From Swiss-Prot:
It comes from Xenopus laevis (African clawed frog). Keywords: Cell membrane, Cell projection, Centromere, Chromosome, Cytoplasm, Membrane, mRNA processing, mRNA splicing, mRNA transport, Neurogenesis, Nucleus, Postsynaptic cell membrane, Repeat, Repressor, Ribonucleoprotein, RNA-binding, Synapse, Synaptosome, Translation regulation, Transport. The keyword Metal-binding does not apply. Residues 484-505, 535-552 have a biased composition (Basic and acidic residues). During early to late tailbud stage, expression intensifies in the craniofacial region with prominent staining in the endodermal, mesodermal and mesenchymal regions of the pharyngeal arches. By early tadpole stage (stage 35), expressed in the forebrain, midbrain, hindbrain and notochord in addition to craniofacial regions including the ear vesicles and eye. In the central nervous system (CNS) of late tadpoles (stage 45), expressed in the olfactory bulbs and the cerebellum. In adults, expressed predominantly in the brain. Signal peptide: none annotated. The lineage of its organism: Eukaryota, Metazoa, Chordata, Craniata, Vertebrata. This is Fragile X messenger ribonucleoprotein 1 homolog A. Coiled coil: none annotated. Pfam families: Agenet, FXMR_C2, FXMRP1_C_core, KH_1, KH_9, Tudor_FRX1. Homodimer. Heterodimer. Residues 471-483 have a biased composition (Gly residues). PANTHER family: FRAGILE X MENTAL RETARDATION SYNDROME-RELATED PROTEIN, FRAGILE X MESSENGER RIBONUCLEOPROTEIN 1. The C-terminal disordered region undergoes liquid-liquid phase separation (LLPS) for the formation of a membraneless compartment that concentrates mRNAs with associated regulatory factors.
Length: 564
């Protein structure tokens, strides 16, 4: 309640500032500023209103003025009547009129004012009206805020409720205010009744809301986020908090920025925990062996990027060796994952699985290397002879184990009698100690791909035993060779591919001749399957018998593989 300011004259003649509280028949009740005196009643003739705002006159010498000063230290300042004796610049020499003895003081213009033009108050200076308050509005009228609009409309300086008499007291300095109060009283009480009804409803609704909120907020989650991760937890423009509030069942989310603490309230525990997953950001360190760092990162960071994408972490950081924030062990590189609790858990599962896989693969490779090393040691100490099929054995069969009449064993033959272009039909390992198994295979394949006798006779020979185009040479012929006249014309019946056509005799023998240094050889190999017309190749035993028969015939001596 606003109070009307007045000036009250004391026993010393000075006027003190006070506030009017009530009006009586011949006095008013006032309270003093700063309560330096108790509340008491003052007669009308000792009360006056302050001068109007802006009232000020020029002060000259010998003018009566009022000085704002105090009589002693216990009393507040008040306005004393005085007279100006002298003016020196901004300073005024004044003489107090209320004192018996002459008392002068030098003051500044701020402590001076012209004499108050208001006269002492009378009974008609104040107006008071009382309005009976209905019983249902008594509680409502006890609130000063309920009469704010009514006070302004009436023009009164005070509207208060008397709880003892159940009346509404209206004080004013204008008689018009009393008339307006009587005119607006019914309307004011009616509006108060409507306001009271609405206020009661609002209070009831507020109570229900509070009870519902307390019931709905039975489940509460509280957690702290690191200060450097608060930006991630809040999100861009509070996106994460808004997303957490949209979770069904969440009633409120509060954030204490000073302590970085989140408070989540909800109707059930699941809703509160789900909202927490959106806001609880943390940092986790996973130790990775140094030898597996490259395989964990992958080419161009493909593998580590896949882990980040699938887990949902915000970022991953690989700490440097000289980073002192995280303790590092020898041979270990820390991988720091930043994100929500769930995303960090997912990243940990993915990375652990990949690390276990890499360790198992390295273990399998190590075992393979150990096995290979053992095999190399065993092979170096005792290497078994290579197993070769029968068709690669050639002349090492049991039928050829003996020596042909007039010839030497193949195992004892040297290479000194042969030219550089000589091709031997033997596949004996003892023929040349430096030959390898692959050399023998090539040699056998050469025998199988050698041209037939008829094919060979079509090529002309040179006198030194080498072939040349044009005419045939005069070298010796082996069995099954062409014995006709050299000058007799011969039809060219050989096929273009000499490898596909082999010359055979009537008994099924395969005629092959290799000439080098005027030497000839005859070799026969038994076919695996008989031909359609029943012809077959001779075995090694038949070949030996045939050679012996040839040696017994009178005529030129036959040279077999360079041996007479």
């Amino acid at each position: 309640m606003e109070e009307l300011a007045v000036e009250v004259r004391g026993s010393n003649g000075a006027f003190y500032k006070a506030f009017m509280k009530d009006v009586h028949e011949d006095s008013i009740t006032v309270t003093f500023e700063n309560n330096w005196q108790q509340e008491r009643q003052i007669p009308f003739h000792d009360v006056r209103f302050p001068p109007p705002s802006g009232y000020n006159k020029d002060i000259n010498e010998r003018d009566e003025v009022e000085v704002y000063s105090r009589a002693n230290e216990k009393e507040p300042c008040c306005w004393w009547l005085a007279k100006v004796r002298m003016i020196k610049g901004e300073f005024y020499v004044i003489e107090y009129a209320a004192c018996d003895a002459t008392y002068n003081e030098i003051v500044t213009i701020e402590r001076l004012r012209s004499v108050n033009p208001n006269k002492p108050a009378t009974k008609s200076s104040f107006h008071k009206v009382k309005l009976d308050v209905p019983e249902d509005l008594r509680q409502m009228c006890a609130k000063d805020s309920a009469h704010k609009d009514f006070k302004k409309a009436v023009g009164a300086f005070s509207v208060s409720y008397d709880s003892e008499n159940y009346q509404l007291v209206i004080l004013s300095v204008n008689e018009v205010s009393i008339k307006r109060a009587s005119m607006l009283s019914d309307m004011h009480f009616r509006s108060l009744r409507t306001k009271l009804s609405l206020m009661l409803r609002n209070e009831e609704a507020s109570k229900q809301l509070e009870s519902s909120r307390q019931l709905a907020s039975r489940f509460h989650e509280q957690f702290i986020v690191r200060e450097d991760l608060m930006g991630l937890a809040i999100g861009t423009h509070g996106a994460n908090i808004q997303q957490a509030r949209k979770v069904p069942g969440v009633t409120a989310i509060d954030l204490d920025e000073d302590t970085c603490t989140f408070h989540i309230y909800g109707e059930d525990q699941e809703a509160v925990k789900k909202a927490r997953t959106y806001l609880e950001f943390a940092e986790n360190v996973i130790q990775v062996p140094r030898n597996l760092v490259g395989k964990v990162i992958g080419k161009n960071g493909k593998l580590i990027q896949e882990i980040v994408d699938k887990s949902g972490v915000v970022r991953v950081r690989i700490e440097a060796e000289n980073d002192k924030n995280i303790s590092q062990e020898e041979g270990i590189v820390p991988f720091v994952f930043v994100g929500t609790k769930d995303s960090i858990t997912n990243a940990t599962v993915l990375l652990d699985y990949h690390l276990n896989y890499l360790k198992e693969v390295d273990q399998l490779r190590l075992e393979r290397l150990q096995i290979d090393e053992q095999l190399r040691h065993i092979g170096a100490s005792s290497r078994p002879p290579p197993n070769r099929p029968d068709k690669e054995k050639g002349y090492l069969s049991e039928d050829c184990s003996g020596t042909v009449r007039g010839s030497r064993p193949y195992s004892n033959r040297g290479r000194s009698r042969r030219g550089t272009g000589y091709a031997s039909g033997t596949n004996s390992e003892a023929s040349n100690a430096s030959e390898t198994e692959s050399d023998h295979r090539d040699e056998l394949s050469d025998w199988s791909l050698a041209p037939a006798e008829d094919d060979r006779d079509n090529y002309h020979r040179r006198g030194d035993g080498r072939r040349r185009g044009g005419t045939r040479g005069q070298g010796m012929r082996g069995r099954g060779g062409f014995k006709g006249n050299d000058d007799q014309p011969r039809p060219d019946n050989r096929q273009r591919n000499s490898r596909e056509t082999k010359a055979r005799t009537s008994d099924g023998s395969l005629q092959i001749r290799l000439d080098c240094n005027n030497e000839r050889s005859v070799h026969t190999k038994t076919l695996q399957n008989a031909s359609v017309d029943g012809s077959r190749l001779r075995t090694g035993k038949d070949r030996v018998q045939k050679k012996e028969k040839t040696d017994g015939v009178d005529g030129p001596q036959v040279v077999v593989n360079g041996v007479p």
